[in-house]
Amino acid sequence: NQTVQPDLWVIVDDGSTDETPQILADYAEQYPFIKIITRENRGHRSVGPGVIEAFYYGYDQVDVSQFDYVCKFDLDLDLPPKYFEVLIERMQQNPRIGTCSGKAYFRDKKNGELISEKCGDEMSVGMTKFYRSICFEAIGGFVRQVMWDGIDCHKCRQLGWIAVSWDEPDLRFIHLRPMGSSQQGIFTGRMRHGFGQYFMGTGLTYMTASSVFRMLHPPYFLGGAAMWWGYVKSLLQRKPRFEDKELVKFINKYQWQCLLKGKTKATDALNARQANIWKQNYA
């Protein structure tokens, strides 16, 4: 239903056992830009690393240099018709934008009301990561671990690119499986997010503030508490952390500025400071 159709849409079927393969085959017959790639069923669902492994299974079979933009895109989304048209227009207007997205909402099961997933404006959302191809290559792609969808945006800023998302009618979409609603429940999903923050190198002070913020939004208290415990549990167990020390240092400095100045002011100031890096390498 998009006003701008893709040149190529690679769909990776990584082991569907329902009617998905037949549905995909029917769509591929109708739309010549759809390419279906089947991947062997792993026997279990692996959130985080598994998601990115599936993405690269398709990505590695495409010559991305032939395309200006690349998008990691989940199928459980209901997008407004002008979604990709608007994103491309924004990127054309500002060549420093490396990755962008709209905002995710989900429907309340009781009254059908749309509820925001509360993604910050300084991030593009994980379920629809729209990238300028040159930027995606510059950051080295996605890390194959939980929190890949946060690390990539920080890497963009480190290299002088801008990561951003907008909450506007043409860019608001419905996420049919909300953030943290893992196959094992909300608590497990939010704990996994807490581990992801730990892995990325987020400090305890920032994580605590972030968890308190999440406690004030659905699912009230439980979501934020689960995130905090997932982080602290990983810290106590001394689980492995992200090995890019320079990027972790960059992230920590930025997060402290967010606590001191507020996220909007801190992000604007950082993007201004990083402008020369982008000009030297990509202008």
Residue ranges and their predicted role:
Residues G43, D78-I115:
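Conserved donor NDP-sugar-binding/catalytic core segment of glycosyltransferases
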Residues D13-Q22, R42-G43, L77:
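A conserved acidic beta->alpha catalytic loop
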Residues F142-S210:
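Catalytic donor/gating beta->alpha subdomain of glycosyltransferases that bind UDP-sugars
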Residues I52-Y69:
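Active-site nucleotide-sugar/metal-binding loop of Leloir-type enzymes
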Residues V125-G140:
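Conserved nucleotide-sugar donor-binding
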Residues N1-P6:
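Short, acidic, metal-binding catalytic loop of nucleotide-sugar glycosyltransferases
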Residues F187-Y282:
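Non-catalytic, C-terminal membrane-associated alpha-helical segments of glycosyltransferases
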Residues Q66-D78:
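Short beta-strand-to-loop acidic/aromatic patch adjacent to the donor-nucleotide binding site
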